[in-house]
Amino acid sequence: MNFAGPTKYLRVPVRRVLDVGCGIGLWKGIVERHFPGASYQGVEFSPYLCERFGWQQGSVVDYAASEPFDWVICQGVLPYLNPADVKAALHNLGRLSKGALYVEAVAREDYEQDIIDEDLTDNRVFRHRAELYRRGLREGFVELGGGVWLSRQAEVPMFALEHVGG
């Protein structure tokens, strides 16, 4: 999936990108390719990775920025959080994004439907229901599908079929 497609289609300008839980920065090159000239801010919980790659240390639960970002990426982070921290993180993502959000998180239903290859997946995660994620994100976002959410701050007019539940 071209994660940048929805924002380009909806004409959401992308100048600042936040990758929260960035790890080794796999998204940095993708962001540079899809959004030339946009600044990339990596935030990571691991002090080692921050020192090695120059990221800012922080957590999706309580990371604060001076102003919201146009694109926020949160891949593979939320399942490691307990339920209370997930709720706080989802609320915080709403504060951090004024444009779009890409979220990737395994859910309990993925395990129940045997979609997860447990030999290749870290099983030291909480198996939150997908509805927990959706309910928390709906507060600040409209679901576009494919893990992409549009901030309610974006004030982008959309036709009913352009978003989930429209």
Where are these regions (language model features)?
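Class I (Rossmann-like) S-adenosyl-L-methionine-dependent methyltransferase catalytic domain
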Residues: M1-E67, L81-A88, N92-G94, G99-G166
